[in-house]
C-alpha cells in the first residue's frame, strides 16, 4: 500500500429511502480501507434518481467542496459506477481525484492478483473500464500518479489512445482464451478421474479460504481484508478412509460486482457452474448476512450455476455472541461451522459424503481372476472398500457411480 494515504470522502445517492445506502457506504468504506485509503468523510443525498450529469445535485456539490476543504480530502469515491460525463463534470467542479466503486474494486483486484491468469483478467477489466472513460477522466490521468485507483498492469497504459487500448484488449482476450482452454482441459481431467468437485462460494471475507485450509491444510492466504484471494485453488479432501472429493475455492462475491470484472473473471467464476456441489460459505457474525446471501445466489443465477446440491456453512460461529440455528431454505444442508475451532467440519464432510453416496450403487461381488480390469475400473472411478483373494476369485465390496454400473 502507499506510504501517503489517500484521504477520501465517500458519496452515495439514496433513491429508495431505506438504509441500503448507509449499508452500502459502510462496505465502500471497508473497500477503501482495503485499498489503503483513509476515509475522512461521507455524504448521502436522498434523490429520486441519480443526477445524469454530476451523480449528486449542485447543492450537494457545494457541500462536498466545503467538506473536502475542511478534511483536507484528496479525492472522492462514489458508491455507484460513474459515466465518463459524470466523472468529468465532478472533476471540473471539485478539482480532486474522482473514483467510483468499480475503479476501487478493480484497484484491489490489481493489488491481489498473483497468477498469470489473474493479472490478465484484471488488466483486461481495467482497460475496458478506462477505455470508455478516457474523455471523462480528463486531468485525472495526470493525477493518477499515486494513491488508490492506479495499481496493476493497466496503470502504465492509461495514456494510450483508444486504438492502442483496443489492440491491447484484443491481445489480452487471446491470452485469456489460451488460459480458458487450459482450464477446460483440467476440468476434463477431473471428470475423467471420477472425483466429484465441490466449489466454495460466498460473499467476500466469509471465510472460504479458512474453511479450505482447515480441511485440507492447503496453505491458502487467509485475511480479514476483502478479496484476500483471487486465484482459485483446488485440493483433494478425504471424506472417509477411501472416498475423496475435490474442493475448489473461488473469488468472493460482492454487491454491485463490476460487470467488467464478471466478464474478465468469467472462467474463474464458472468453477461454480461446472462443480457438482455448491458449498455456500456465509459469515454468520455479519449483521448483513441475509443481504449478502441474496447477492451470492443472484450471482450464481447470473453464472448459470443453479439446480445443484447446495450445502450452506454458517461460518465464523466463534464470533457469534448468541448462536442461532440458521437454516438456508435454498440449500439441501445447513451447518454451523467455525474454521477456527473446527466446529461443524466433520458434519460438513458427512454431508458431502451423503450427497456422493446418493449417486452411487453399493456392490458386493465375486470376480474371476481374469476380470482384474473391472476391479481396476472400480478403483479408478468408484470407491473400493475391500478386495479379498479367495480360491474362487476376488471378493469385492465397493461404491460405484451409476454410469459404470452396467460395465461391471
Q: Can you say where each PLM-predicted feature lies in the sequence?
A:
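Flexible beta-alpha connector loops of hexameric P-loop NTPases
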Residues: 15-19, 50-54, 112-116, 156-157, ...
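Conserved C-terminal guanine-recognition region of P-loop GTPase G domains, centered on the G4
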Residues: 24-33, 65-70, 82-96, 242-243, ...
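Alpha-helical coiled-coil heptad-repeat register
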Residues: 121-124, 128-131, 135-138, 159, ...
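Conserved nucleotide-binding/hydrolysis micro-motifs of P-loop NTPases
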Residues: 14-18, 47-49, 81-84, 103-106, ...
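Canonical P-loop GTPase G-domain recognition
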Residues: 96-146, 306-311, 316-369
Amino acid at each position: 500500500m502507499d506510504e501517503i494515504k489517500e484521504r477520501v470522502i465517500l458519496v452515495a445517492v439514496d433513491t429508495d429511502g431505506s438504509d441500503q445506502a448507509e449499508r452500502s457506504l459502510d462496505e465502500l468504506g471497508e473497500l477503501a480501507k482495503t485499498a489503503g485509503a483513509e476515509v475522512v468523510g461521507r455524504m448521502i443525498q436522498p434523490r429520486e434518481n441519480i443526477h445524469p450529469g454530476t451523480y449528486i445535485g449542485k447543492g450537494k456539490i457545494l457541500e462536498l467542496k466545503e467538506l473536502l476543504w475542511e478534511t483536507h480530502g484528496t479525492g472522492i469515491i462514489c458508491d455507484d459506477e460513474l459515466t465518463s460525463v459524470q466523472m468529468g463534470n465532478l472533476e471540473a467542479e471539485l478539482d480532486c481525484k474522482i473514483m467510483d466503486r468499480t475503479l476501487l474494486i478493480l484497484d484491489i483486484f490489481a493489488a491481489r492478483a498473483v497468477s498469470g491468469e489473474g493479472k490478465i483478467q484484471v488488466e483486461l477489466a481495467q482497460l475496458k473500464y478506462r477505455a470508455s472513460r478516457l474523455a471523462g477522466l480528463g486531468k485525472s490521468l495526470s493525477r493518477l500518479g499515486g494513491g488508490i485507483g492506479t495499481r496493476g498492469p493497466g496503470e502504465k497504459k492509461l495514456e494510450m489512445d483508444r486504438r492502442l487500448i483496443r489492440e491491447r484488449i484484443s491481445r489480452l482476450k487471446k491470452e485469456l482464451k489460451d488460459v480458458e482452454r487450459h482450464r477446460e482441459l483440467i476440468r476434463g481431467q477431473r471428470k475423467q478421474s471420477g472425483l466429484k468437485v465441490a466449489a466454495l462460494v460466498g460473499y467476500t471475507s466469509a471465510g472460504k479460504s479458512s474453511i479450505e485450509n482447515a480441511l485440507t491444510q492447503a496453505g491458502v492466504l487467509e485475511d480479514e481484508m476483502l478479496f484476500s484471494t483471487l486465484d482459485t485453488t483446488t485440493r483433494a479432501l478425504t471424506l472417509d478412509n477411501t472416498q475423496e472429493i475435490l474442493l475448489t475455492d473461488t473469488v468472493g462475491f460482492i454487491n454491485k460486482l463490476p460487470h467488467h470484472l464478471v466478464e474478465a473473471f468469467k472462467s474463474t467464476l464458472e468453477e461454480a457452474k461446472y462443480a457438482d456441489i455448491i458449498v455456500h460459505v456465509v459469515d454468520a457474525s455479519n449483521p448483513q448476512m441475509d443481504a449478502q446471501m441474496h447477492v451470492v445466489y443472484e450471482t450464481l443465477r447470473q453464472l448459470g450455476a443453479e439446480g445443484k446440491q447446495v450445502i450452506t456453512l454458517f461460518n465464523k460461529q466463534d464470533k457469534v455472541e448468541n448462536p442461532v440455528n440458521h437454516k438456508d431454505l435454498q440449500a439441501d444442508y445447513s451447518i454451523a461451522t467455525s474454521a477456527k475451532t473446527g466446529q461443524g467440519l466433520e458434519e460438513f464432510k458427512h454431508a458431502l459424503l451423503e450427497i456422493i453416496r446418493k449417486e452411487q450403487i453399493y456392490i458386493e461381488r465375486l470376480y474371476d481372476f481374469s476380470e482384474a480390469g473391472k476391479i481396476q475400473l472400480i478403483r479408478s472411478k468408484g470407491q473400493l472398500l475391500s478386495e479379498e483373494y479367495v480360491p474362487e476369485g476376488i471378493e469385492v465390496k465397493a461404491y460405484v457411480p451409476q454410469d459404470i454400473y452396467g460395465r461391471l
